[in-house]
């Protein structure tokens, strides 16, 4: 969060609840002052149940069920996105006083999870949508975009900001004075500074202070000027969670199997207590690549966080080719068809997977009657000052009014 404040002080983060709705995560981010990007009434209710004001929520789902719109109106959630005429008609009928944000289509080809195939109005459609909103006497207050989840090309944000400015200008032509820009998500840890630099440059070029700061020429009648928000999800939580899995079974390949396959056959198949129907659904739905590190061998702790996978010294342990599987009876429940782990690894030992905080447990199922992995929160032994600050913030959530 402090890194965000340092690099993007002009932009208020609205955490994407869908990414990881663990209560402690939400409480900590609420105490830090973030808003919340909610995609359903259930997520909205989760935030409201924390005692937060509806003003800290954007209902960032352009295509909502009518019943959800009615519920949002009853919950006093008054900011949502749209990208089509039917949604405007729906809003007019069920939530006519809601403030609307037009989601535009951007180039998301440089992202791991591309969303443009499902959401976002092309720029050529913007005039028609704004004309319909004007006809229905609806209040369109701004523009949003999303470059896709897990964006690996910072320049995608520059192009998206350029398109957003085009939509802002179209809004003025239709009598709207927009004062909200929602730059969506797509933020990654490894290139965050590069993305932030592109955003600062793009915003300075297309949304300069002289035009969009309070009193600016493009925000007449808007005392607060242009408000810029974002919807980061994995940026906040991906690296904050690690998943430890227990090896519940092992199947060794017969020597003749390995010989017949020319050595390509895994010498061992390990079965662990979480799989693709659990936290590892991220492999299928979020296109994540995971690599295990060894936590224990022969019930002895061997994990080293300073080494790449498998997290043990090769001089200390002989590695062999193997595969890793989840606990269900479905053959699609495969974590890795080929990796290398210590030959001494046995039933009862543990593996650990880093960067498992985003789009993992939130989509886990109970297939085969199995329960999702439990979450345990720790504060670390080498960050006492940070730990104390976190505990203080969480305590403030429980005691204070955060509205």
Would you name each region that the model predicts?
Residues 1:
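Conserved oxyanion/phosphate-binding beta-strand-loop segments in alpha/beta enzyme cores
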Residues 11-180, 187, 192-193, 202-207, ...:
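Active-site-proximal beta-alpha core segment in soluble small-molecule metabolic enzymes
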Residues 49-52, 73-74, 92-95, 111, ...:
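Solvent-exposed alpha-helices and their adjacent loops that cap or buttress functional pockets
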Residues 198, 208-218, 227-403:
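Charged (often Lys/Glu-rich) extended helix/loop segments that serve as interaction or gating elements
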Residues 17, 185, 230-232:
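A general secondary-structure junction signal
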Residues 53, 122, 222, 398-399:
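Short, solvent-exposed coil/turn linker segments
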């Amino acid at each position: 969060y402090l890194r965000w404040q340092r690099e993007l002080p002009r932009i208020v983060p609205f955490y994407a609840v869908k990414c990881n709705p663990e209560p402690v995560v939400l409480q900590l981010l609420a105490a830090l002052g973030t808003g919340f990007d909610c995609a359903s009434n259930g997520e909205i209710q989760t935030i409201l149940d924390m005692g937060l004001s509806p003003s800290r929520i954007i209902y960032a789902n352009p295509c909502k069920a009518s019943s959800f719109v009615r519920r949002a109106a009853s919950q006093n959630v008054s900011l949502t996105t749209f990208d089509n005429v039917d949604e405007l008609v729906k809003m007019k009928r069920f939530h006519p006083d809601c403030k609307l944000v037009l989601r535009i289509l951007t180039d998301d080809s440089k992202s791991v999870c591309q969303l443009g195939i499902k959401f976002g109005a092309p720029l050529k459609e913007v005039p028609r949508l704004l004309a319909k909103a004007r006809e229905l006497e609806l209040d369109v207050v701004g523009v949003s975009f999303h470059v896709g989840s897990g964006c690996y090309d910072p320049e995608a944000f520059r192009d998206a900001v350029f398109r957003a400015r085009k939509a802002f200008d179209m809004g003025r032509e239709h009598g709207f004075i927009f004062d909200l820009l929602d730059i969506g998500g797509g933020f990654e840890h490894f290139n965050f500074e590069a993305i932030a630099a592109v955003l600062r440059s793009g915003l300075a070029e297309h949304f300069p202070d002289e035009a969009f700061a309070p009193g600016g020429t493009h925000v007449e009648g808007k005392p607060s000027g242009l408000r810029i928000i974002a919807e980061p999800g994995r940026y906040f939580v991906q690296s904050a969670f690690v998943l430890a899995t227990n090896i519940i079974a092992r199947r060794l390949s017969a020597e003749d199997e390995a010989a017949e396959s020319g050595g390509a056959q895994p010498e061992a198949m390990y079965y662990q207590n979480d799989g693709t129907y659990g936290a590892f659904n991220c492999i299928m739905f979020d296109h994540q690549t995971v690599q295990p590190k060894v936590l224990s061998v022969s019930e002895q702790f061997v994990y080293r966080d300073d080494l790449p996978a498998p997290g043990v010294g090769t001089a200390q342990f002989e590695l062999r080719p193997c595969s890793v599987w989840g606990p269900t009876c479905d053959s699609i429940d495969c974590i890795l068809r080929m990796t290398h782990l210590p030959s001494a690894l046995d039933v009862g030992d543990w593996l650990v997977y880093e960067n498992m905080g985003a789009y993992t447990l939130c989509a886990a199922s109970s297939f085969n009657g199995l329960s999702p992995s439990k979450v345990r929160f720790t504060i670390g032994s080498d960050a006492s000052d940070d730990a104390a600050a976190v505990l203080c913030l969480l305590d403030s959530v429980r005691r204070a009014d955060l509205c």
